[in-house]
Amino acid sequence: MDGLLTPRESAKFIAENSRDVFIDDGGVRRVAELLLAKATGPELRIEGWKAIHELNPRGTDEAAVNWVFVTDTLNFSFWSESDEYKCQVGFGGKTYSGYWSLCAAVNRALDEGIPITSASYYATVTLDEVRHILRSDTDVPMPLIEERHRILNETGKILLEKFGGSFLNCVQKSDKSAQKLLHLVVENFPSYRDVTQFEGKRISFYKRAQILVADTWSVLEGKGDGCFKDISSITMFADYRLPQVLVYLGALKYSNELLEKLLKGEMLFYGNRQEVEIRGCSVWCVELIRDCLLELIEKKGEKTTGEINSILLDYYLWDYARDHREDMKGIPFHHTRCIYY
């Protein structure tokens, strides 16, 4: 990892050298003020991960941890070319799209007796079986099916070889350190290596690896093997929804040139300068929002129910984006098709 900036260092460096994406200090403060009203409620608590999302596992056992591992291994590229035509999966009487279509497909497979969360199964699962497991209820398939198949096989084999087929063994090797778990994941599983170049420096976002650590912390409710002492070192997860909501809320701004590109729906390739700026500035923006929010909480003498970190802010803003999808229609999100987010 020599000379490689951490996600937080990367974000700060990108924000300081950005040409097309800018953080608005007034907007940062306004978002922090919006979040202040939620600081004492259930929305910014670890319990919300299970309470608000019915597809997430209820348990805190090995099976729940392995569910998290397989969903985050496949947690990338759910955006559709059109809002009208998208991949949708029905489960439990409800229809889901985006990331939740994956969770619904995993739960549907488990209900059908397919052991999709077992490494010994997905290490050798065939492409046709993956197509069946991730099948859409519409004519639009889940994107990147071949990549998902390849990654499942690769990841399953590594989990069997190095960690006895269970992600819980990997978690237990981390000595209750979020950073140690993050490094175990990116060192052992190639598809989690979300690393590129910017201004001559090697930078990392580790979107899926960080969300895997965060979801492990959440599914274990921050207790036992999931009691990570350094959980606040994890940043927001740089994807395509969070930048959109930060622009909508006025905390992030795009240059006219970039905005035009995004409005036209032009693809930005992974590692492209503007794509890196969007992701990096979003991460740094959430770090600044968190700092501002903690300052406001201290000034008001509010009592929060637990430590407020970037993970909980990310969870809240991501849900906010989903709940305000109609209002945000005029704000474009960037189109990048890759396995990292």
Curated annotation (Swiss-Prot):
Keyword DNA-binding part of the UniProt annotation: no
Active site: 239 (nucleophile or transition state stabilizer)
InterPro entries on file: Q_salvage
Binding site for queuine: 53, 237, 239, 314-315, 319
Main EC class the enzyme belongs to: hydrolase
Residues with the N-acetylmethionine modification: 1
Gene giving rise to this polypeptide: QNG1
EC number, as in UniProt: 3.2.2.-
Miscellaneous comment in the UniProt entry for this protein: Eukaryotes lack the canonical genes for de novo biosynthesis of queuosine (Q), present in most bacteria. Therefore, this molecule must be sourced from ingested food and/or the gut microbiota, and metabolized to its corresponding nucleobase, queuine (q), before incorporation into cytoplasmic and mitochondrial tRNAs. Incorporation of q into the anticodon of some tRNAs contributes to translational efficiency and accuracy.
BP GO annotations: nucleoside salvage; tRNA-guanine transglycosylation
Function, as annotated: Catalyzes the hydrolysis of queuosine 5'-phosphate, releasing the nucleobase queuine (q). Is required for salvage of queuine from exogenous queuosine (Q) that is imported and then converted to queuosine 5'-phosphate intracellularly.
Catalysed conversion reaction: queuosine 5'-phosphate + H2O = queuine + D-ribose 5-phosphate
Keyword flag Hydrolase: yes
Protein name: Queuosine 5'-phosphate N-glycosylase/hydrolase
Family from the record: Belongs to the QNG1 protein family.
One GO MF term: hydrolase activity
Keywords: Acetylation, Hydrolase
Pfam families: Q_salvage
